[in-house]
């Protein structure tokens, strides 16, 4: 294996200037996300979600962004999963988007709250049939005996809903993340990257600061 310490890449594709920054970070995020989609970035809506246990132990996993409404980031998951249990006790959350092809990252901190059951129902109905069945039978984050256990449960549940509308289970739904800090990172040559931090103030306006790389 190649020496890991020798692996590096020079970032040269773009820059981020103060004059380009809108007052609202959601506007810049939407533009960057669209540019990632237009550039055919693999999984442009992938989010690294960070939560914390009651003991202060962090954990991360990757989910997909499924909406950006009223300034909130929306994703869906099993409420009984590890992240769901942690968010029930501590709503503080971090989200990270990494678009390697564009040499860009966005890091978000905020609080998460469940979306309404009606909103979760609406999205659940849009999911592929087999994904809906899978959501009903998977005890997410829990130990299982084998993959065959999942397959058997899937086949049994699919037969139960044959010819019927698959209902959303109560333990599955969405979270809306309200951001309070958003950092935009653009790779630059010589590791002199551009970093800008938006911080939400008590008056509802965003303060913008350039950070040292």
From Swiss-Prot:
Binding residues for substrate: 8-11, 66, 123, 127, 131, 191-193
Keywords: Flavoprotein, FMN, Oxidoreductase, Pyridoxine biosynthesis
EC number: 1.4.3.5
Binding site for FMN: 61-66, 76-77, 82-83, 105, 140-141, 185, 195
A single GO molecular function term of this UniProt record: FMN binding
Cofactor(s) named in the record: FMN
InterPro entries: Pyridox_Oxase, Pyridox_Oxase_CS, Pyridox_Oxase_N, Pyridoxamine_oxidase_dimer_C, Split_barrel_FMN-bd
Keyword Phosphoprotein: no
Name of this protein: Pyridoxine/pyridoxamine 5'-phosphate oxidase
The organism of origin for this protein: Bacteroides thetaiotaomicron (strain ATCC 29148 / DSM 2079 / JCM 5827 / CCUG 10774 / NCTC 10582 / VPI-5482 / E50)
Source lineage: Bacteria, Pseudomonadati, Bacteroidota, Bacteroidia, Bacteroidales
Gene: pdxH
């Amino acid at each position: 294996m190649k020496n890991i310490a020798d692996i590096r890449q020079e970032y040269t594709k773009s820059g981020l200037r103060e004059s380009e920054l809108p007052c609202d970070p959601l506007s810049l995020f939407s533009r960057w996300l669209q540019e990632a989609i237009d550039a055919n970035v693999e999984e442009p809506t992938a989010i690294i979600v960070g939560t914390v246990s009651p003991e202060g132990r962090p954990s991360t996993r990757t989910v997909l962004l499924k909406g950006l409404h009223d300034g909130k980031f929306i994703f869906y998951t099993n409420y009984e999963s590890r992240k769901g249990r942690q968010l029930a006790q501590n709503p503080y959350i971090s989200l990270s988007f990494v678009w390697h092809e564009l040499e860009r990252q966005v890091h978000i901190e905020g609080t998460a709250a469940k979306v309404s059951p009606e909103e979760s129902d609406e999205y659940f109905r849009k999911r592929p049939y087999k994904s809906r069945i899978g959501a009903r039978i998977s005890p997410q984050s829990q130990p299982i005996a084998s993959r065959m256990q999942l397959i058997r449960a899937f086949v049994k549940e699919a037969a139960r809903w044959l010819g019927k509308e698959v209902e959303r289970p109560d333990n599955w739904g969405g979270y809306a993340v309200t951001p309070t800090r958003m950092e935009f990172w653009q790779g630059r040559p010589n590791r002199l990257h551009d970093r800008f931090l938006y911080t939400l103030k008590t008056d509802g306006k965003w303060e913008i600061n350039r950070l040292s790389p």
